[in-house]
Each structure stands twice: as structure tokens, then as C-alpha cells.
Curated annotation (Swiss-Prot):
Record's function text: Part of the Sec protein translocase complex. Interacts with the SecYEG preprotein conducting channel. Has a central role in coupling the hydrolysis of ATP to the transfer of proteins into and across the cell membrane, serving as an ATP-driven molecular motor driving the stepwise translocation of polypeptide chains across the membrane.
One Pfam family per UniProt: SecA_SW
Assigned protein family: Belongs to the SecA family.
SMART domains according to UniProt: SecA_DEAD (SM00957), SecA_PP_bind (SM00958)
InterPro entries noted in UniProt: Helicase_ATP-bd, Helicase_C-like, P-loop_NTPase, SecA, SecA_Actinobact-type, SecA_CS, SecA_DEAD, SecA_motor_DEAD
Top EC group: translocase
This protein's name: Protein translocase subunit SecA 2
Length: 763
């Protein structure tokens, strides 16, 4: 803990003071053990309820002791003092920094149970379906011991199953599914159709992944409507273009530009006079740019894979296949056309919410991760969350070797293979962390050519990968994994049953090898943390080349001289420091992008709150009828013979349709504004100021337009005992909707537009 003293001082000491108080409370827990052990289950549960009555805990030490005794009785797990400390910090609203293997699952369940006993509804948020279902079932005996209900949400559940699950006091669910349910509930016109019940607290597992890495990933609800898919001929013509002759790609390979020669070739083969004529700018040129981006910049097995005749994106922050993600605005269809697959239907975005805004809906949020300290600035700046560092139950014995730096990528890759082969020859288990699917497959192929058996995890199946990663610590195992594969599953030395534990300890424990530095040190530390759990020995080692993305990007514009040996190895502290500098530069770039993006997103998030409140009132009261009757009294008088409930629901359907439609149009408009804000900003205002001015003006117009449109429809639509016949007026809601996550696009440039190279003509 002493190593973090400077850190707590930098934060003004608040977290440090909380830590001292928490430790003092935990030190008293054991004083209650004898008395509580003598109580039967009913009396023990009642004691906890009494302590938490009124929404606050009267005696934290005794309360933690009760949770601990109940855990031992129901799960056979006695929490360590450091786990009880983490429970207390969660209950008080912190993000706790707990190393891998220190028992976060039990900590989260104890905290959720404690908050549930205080009368709060809790969502325990995970990163995937598998962990949500696993943790809910594993921790169920503890939660139900106190008379609380627990359930889980998963992708395959229908609306009825979800509705029932959300009634539980504690709900485990993947963050994307919870967000999608929020969006779907924003389209209901009858309260009983909602699936969610409001929750008071979000406990977020892998908090840095959700709150930082994926914070600005939009969750999208779309309805059926044709989109901007490139025509087949355009795809064929673009495929014939040659790099450098017909188009150029910028140095960081994020943007592609047609040359005059390329434009002329396209115009000739498409039979048009100019791509840049008004009639083609908003249609043909958009489709050409989409096809060109798909062809030149998006690489199979790096940015996406093709499986079962479908394009599946690879999530850059997790290094995993993301079944639910799509690229926006026709790029998905462009890649499908490039691969010769059936082009998926376009759609109109009905609603969208970022994960950051989703978490902001909870009155209280807290979380757990093994790399919270590195994300302290973001957690404090964007969520006002404090980090509490929880000491390890056993001292760390892992050895973190200095980076091995090579001049070229090829030399680095040869060294990685040699090192894995050397470690494997001793029987020491090896876990290799790669950055993408293609790299992991290439590495596995090279190792198999040396007759080394390899397990490859590309995060395609969460349950299967959990079983494989659980065995990664066994003798002689070599496991190659993308960044996030298998998180949430412990790697125990000697295999899942620890049968060969002693022998693996003698070999030095699990060796973790990183094939390159990540864009932030926090991601490196996530990989390092797989070794050395619970005081086990272990090794971590990263290989770096001067050609690696983080070095090229972070060191752009700088030059460095180095003298490699015959193998390409550069053994220089100066170069290691420079690589660290490059990584810090990329971290700063990411933080700046996050900050800029949040400044744009926050106003829309605030406007969403107003829309949500308006929607709630329209759903739950007679406000819709009252307003329409006030604006169109003659029409209201014509409907007096109808049953009151029919009249009110008809008015509700009308008002909600136009509110939802205009909100959807507002989102689309503001997306357009943001894409071209650098052109629309006037000289005396910053782009952000101009964006806010437009957003406020347009939102005011939205509010009035939604009412005016509703009044117009109210006057003209047929309303009878069956309600308002909106379909007859062409006002039907989409017949089909679907949800997806907009990818953290690999092509997003410094302006953070989704496809910055297409620019303001994109739409």
C-alpha cells in the first residue's frame, strides 16, 4: 500500500482516509464471529435485516460479519479480511482495485446482498452472458439466505422472461443487454409492456472496461428502413482500383482518398459525368466512399471475421469477436458486399445511448477491477467515482521482466516463438496475449510447426473459453488468447483442479507473454494480472518492436537511434523509456478523445433525461388526452362517447409516436451536425459551443414540433373503440426492430467522427 501513498496525496487524501476507516471496521469483524456462529439461519438473517433497516447500516463490522458467516454456511467460502474491506467500499460507492484471483465474484455478491437488505434494487453488471448466468447461479444460495431474490439476464431471453427476471432484488446481466432493454422500454405505449423495473445501484464487474474502454460505445435500437448499401456494380468497380494510382491512404491507415485518376475511372465505368455533381454527392459518392473504406482499410481477421456467411466485428478494446456489434451508416453493408455475402437490411436509428450515459441513469454506481488505479483520472472526471485499493491477501511473487525490444516486427515475432518454445520445453505453462485474431492464428500456426500443442482463444464462445482458460495453468499448456478472452475465470496452477499445483510452482508458475504493448498501460496490466494470483509465483514479459502500432503512433514525428544486436534485440534503458513515452502519448490521446466526445455527448444525455421524464408522464397519466383536448377541443368533444380509457390510450399512442419520432430525427440531425461542425462553427465560437447552440435550439423545436404534429394527427386520424388507427395515416411504428452496438471504429480519426475520412459529405 505504501507504494500508492503519493497517489492518495494527489487525490487530497479522501480515499486514503476512507481506507483507514474501512480497515479499522474490518479489524472488528472477528469480534462478532463467536456470537453470530451460535445463531441459527433464521436468527442470523433477521439480525442482518434489523441492522440494515431504514436504508442504512447501523453497525458495519457486525453487518460484514453476518455476511461472512452466511457466505461460509451457504457457499463454503469464508471471506478474507481484504474481501470484507472491498465489500464495505462497494457499499459506500467506490470502485475497488482488486488484483486478479482475489475473489471479486464473492465480494460483488456480498455487496449486492448488503445493498439489497438496505432496500435497494441492484443490477450486477457483467461483460458477457456467461458471467451473468454463472455468477447469479453460483451466488444464489447466499442471496436467498436473506430472503432476497436473484435472477440473470441473457441475450436469448424473450420479453416475458426478462420482465420476470427484472422483478428480482438483485439482477445479474451483461451491460449491453441491460442497455438494450432500456432502449426497448423507450418505445412502449403501455406501462405493462415495460420489462425493466428501476434499479438503485449498479455494481460493475471489470469496471474499467465498461466505464472507460467502452464508455462511448453507443447501444443502438433500429427499425426496418432501407439504408445506404453500396450497389453491386460500385463494389466491383472499387475492387478494381489500385492503391497509389487510384487512391491514397494516410500514414496511420485510417483514411482513404480518391485520386483524380481514380475518380475518373469510377465515373467512366459507372457512366456518370462527375461524382461530385449535386445528384451524386448524397448517393453515389457516399456509396463509393463506403465501398472504398471497406476495400482498402478494413482487413479480414484484423477488423472482422466471416463466420456462417456473416461479417462479425472484432472489438478492438477486448480483442474479441463481437456478435452484437455492427458498423454504422452503411459500412456494414459495404463490407458484406466486399466479401460477396448477402447484404443486411439497412435501418433507421430509433434511439441510442452510450454506456457512459447508461451508467449515469443509476442513482449510485460502484465497481471492481484489477486495474482501477490506472483509470483513476477517467473514473473521477467522468463519473465522480473514487478508487479504493484493496491489498492482496498474499504478497505478490510474480516477476515482471523488462520489455524485450526489437528493431523490426519480424525479429520480434521470431523471438516470441523462441521464448515460448524455451519455456514450453521446461513444462512451464504459458499464456500469450495477442492483439487480434489474425495475430493469434499466425502465432499458433508457427508454434504447431514446432510440434507445440496450442489452445487458441479468440473469444468466440464465452462458456467454452472459460473452460479452456481455467486449464491454462496446467503443466505444458500453451494458450494463445486475444486481450479479453477468458476474463472472469481464474487460472489456477496445476489446472482447474490444481492436481499438479506443486510441480507448476517449482517451474515458476504461469508465464504471461504480451506480443506488444497496448495503447494504455492499464491494458498491459490486465494481461500481467493473469499470473501471480493469491501469492503464486509467475512471470510476465512483453515483446516490443519499433514497428508496433503504439510506438509508431505515440512516437509520430520523433526520431530515435538504436543499436540492435545480431538478433535485432535492443537492450537499452533509453529505448525502453522511449517506448514508455510513446505509450503515455497514446494514453493521452485516448483521454483527450474521451473528454471531447463526452463534452458532445453530455448535452444529448441531459436532453434524453427530459425526454424520458416527458415519456413517463405521458405513459402513467392522462396528460396526453388533457393536452390534446386543450389544443383541439372540438375534436375532443366528438370523442366524448368513447370509453375514457380508450380515449386516453388513443391520445397516448398519438403523443408518444410523435415524441419518439421527433427524438429519433433529433439524434440523426445532431449526428449530422457533429460530423460537419468544423464547417458550421462561426469564427467567434468554438465547434463545441456551436454544437451546443444548435442542440439547444433544435431541442426546443423538437418539443414544440412533437406537440404540433400530435395535435394535427389527433384532428385527422380515425379514433374509435379500438383506439387510434395510426397505421391508416402512415404513422405505423417499425414492424421489426433490432439492437446492436456501434463498433469502436478502427477508422475513427482525431476528430472522433465515425468514419472521419468520408467527411461532411458522408450523409
Amino acid at each position: 500500500m505504501a507504494g500508492f501513498d503519493w497517489f492518495w496525496k494527489a487525490l487530497g487524501g479522501k480515499s486514503g482516509r476512507n481506507q483507514k476507516r474501512s480497515v479499522a471496521i474490518v479489524n472488528q469483524v472477528e469480534n462478532h464471529a463467536a456470537e453470530l456462529d451460535a445463531l441459527d439461519d433464521v436468527a442470523l438473517a433477521q439480525r442482518a435485516k434489523d441492522l440494515a433497516s431504514g436504508g442504512r447500516i447501523d453497525n458495519h463490522a457486525e453487518f460484514l460479519a453476518i455476511l461472512g458467516v452466511a457466505s461460509q454456511r451457504t457457499l463454503g467460502l469464508k471471506p478474507y479480511p481484504v474481501q470484507s474491506q472491498a465489500v464495505l467500499r462497494l457499499i459506500e460507492g467506490d470502485v475497488v482495485h482488486m488484483a486478479t484471483g482475489e475473489g471479486k465474484t464473492l465480494v460483488g455478491a456480498m455487496a449486492a446482498t448488503g445493498l439489497g437488505l438496505m432496500g435497494k434494487r441492484v443490477h450486477s453488471i457483467t461483460v458477457n452472458d456467461y458471467l451473468a448466468v454463472r455468477d447469479a447461479e453460483w451466488m444464489r444460495p447466499l442471496v436467498e439466505f436473506f430472503g432476497l431474490s436473484v435472477a440473470s439476464i441473457s441475450e436469448k431471453m424473450d420479453a416475458g422472461e426478462r420482465r420476470q427476471a427484472y422483478k428480482a432484488a438483485i439482477v445479474y446481466g451483461p451491460v449491453n443487454e441491460i442497455g438494450f432493454d432500456v432502449l426497448r422500454d423507450q418505445l412502449i405505449t403501455r406501462r405493462e409492456d415495460a420489462v425493466q423495473h428501476g434499479a438503485d445501484v449498479a455494481i460493475i464487474d471489470e469496471a474499467d472496461s465498461v466505464l472507460v474502454d467502452e464508455a462511448l460505445v453507443p447501444l443502438v435500437l433500429a427499425g426496418n428502413q432501407p439504408g445506404h448499401a453500396p450497389r453491386g456494380k460500385i463494389t466491383d468497380v472499387v475492387r478494381s482500383l489500385k492503391e497509389n494510382d487510384d487512391y491514397t491512404i494516410d500514414d496511420d491507415r485510417r483514411n482513404v482518398f480518391l485520386t483524380d485518376k481514380g475518380a475518373a475511372k469510377l465515373e467512366q465505368q459507372l457512366g456518370i459525368s462527375s461524382l461530385y455533381d449535386d445528384e451524386h454527392v448524397g448517393s453515389t459518392l457516399v456509396q463509393v466512399n463506403l465501398a472504398l473504406h471497406a476495400q482498402a482499410l478494413l482487413i479480414r481477421d484484423i477488423h472482422y471475421i466471416v463466420r456462417d456467411s456473416k461479417v462479425l466485428l472484432i472489438d478492438a478494446s477486448r480483442g474479441r469477436v463481437a456478435d452484437l456489434q455492427r458498423w454504422p451508416d452503411g459500412l456494414q453493408a459495404a463490407v458484406e458486399a466486399k466479401e460477396g455475402l448477402a447484404v443486411s437490411e439497412g435501418g433507421k436509428i430509433l434511439d441510442t445511448i452510450t454506456l457512459q450515459a447508461l451508467i449515469g441513469r443509476y442513482p449510485m454506481a460502484c465497481g471492481m477491477t484489477g486495474t482501477a488505479v490506472e483509470a483513476t483520472d477517467q473514473l473521477r472526471t467522468f463519473y465522480d467515482l473514487h478508487v479504493s485499493v484493496i491489498e492482496r491477501n498474499h504478497p505478490l511473487k510474480r516477476f515482471d521482466e523488462a520489455d524485450r525490444i526489437y528493431a523490426t516486427m519480424a525479429e520480434k515475432n521470431r523471438a516470441i516463438i523462441d521464448e515460448i518454445a524455451l519455456l514450453h520445453s521446461t513444462g512451464q505453462p504459458v499464456l500469450v496475449g495477442t492483439h487480434d485474431v489474425a495475430e493469434s492464428e499466425e502465432l499458433a500456426t508457427a508454434l504447431r510447426e514446432l510440434n507445440i500443442e496450442v489452445s487458441v482463444l479468440n473469444a468466440k464462445n464465452d462458456a467454452e473459453e472459460a473452460q479452456i482458460i481455467a486449464e491454462a495453468g496446467d503443466i505444458g499448456r500453451v494458450t494463445v488468447s486475444t486481450q479479453m478472452a477468458g476474463r472472469g475465470t481464474d487460472i489456477r496452477l496445476g489446472g482447474a483442479d490444481e492436481a499438479d499445483y506443486d510441480e507448476v510452482v517449482k517451474l515458476g508458475g504461469l508465464a504471461v507473454i504480451g506480443t506488444a504493448r497496448h495503447r494504455s498501460q492499464r491494458l498491459d496490466n490486465q494481461l500481467r494480472g493473469r499470473a501471480g494470483r493469491q501469492g503464486d509465483p509467475g512471470l510476465s514479459l512483453f515483446f516490443v518492436s519499433l514497428d508496433d502500432d503504439v510506438v509508431v503512433s505515440g512516437g509520430s514525428g520523433e526520431s530515435v537511434s538504436a543499436q540492435p544486436d545480431a538478433t535485432g534485440l535492443i537492450d537499452s534503458d533509453r529505448i525502453r523509456d522511449w517506448v514508455g513515452h510513446c505509450q503515455r502519448v497514446t494514453e493521452g490521446q485516448l483521454l483527450e478523445i474521451h473528454s471531447q466526445s463526452w463534452n458532445y455527448n453530455k448535452l444529448l444525455a441531459d436532453q434524453r433525461v427530459i425526454i424520458d421524464e416527458r415519456r413517463e408522464r405521458l405513459l402513467d397519466t392522462a396528460l396526453a388526452w388533457e393536452e390534446l383536448a386543450q389544443h383541439a377541443p372540438a375534436r375532443a368533444a366528438e370523442l366524448e362517447d368513447l370509453d375514457q380509457s380508450v380515449r386516453e390510450q388513443a391520445a397516448r399512442d398519438i403523443m408518444l409516436y410523435h415524441l419518439d419520432y421527433n427524438w429519433s430525427e433529433h439524434l440523426a440531425l445532431m449526428d449530422d451536425v457533429r460530423e460537419s461542425i468544423h464547417l458550421r462553427a462561426i469564427a467567434r465560437e468554438t465547434p463545441l459551443d456551436e454544437y451546443h447552440r444548435i442542440a439547444v435550439r433544435e431541442f426546443k423545436d423538437l418539443a414544440q414540433r412533437a406537440v404540433d404534429d400530435a395535435v394535427s394527427t389527433f384532428k385527422s386520424v380515425t379514433i374509435d373503440h379500438e383506439g387510434a388507427h395510426l397505421d391508416d395515416e402512415g404513422l405505423a411504428r417499425p414492424s421489426a426492430t433490432w439492437t446492436y452496438m456501434v463498433s469502436d471504429n478502427p477508422l475513427a480519426g482525431s476528430g472522433n467522427s465515425v468514419i472521419s475520412g468520408i467527411g461532411n459529405i458522408f450523409r
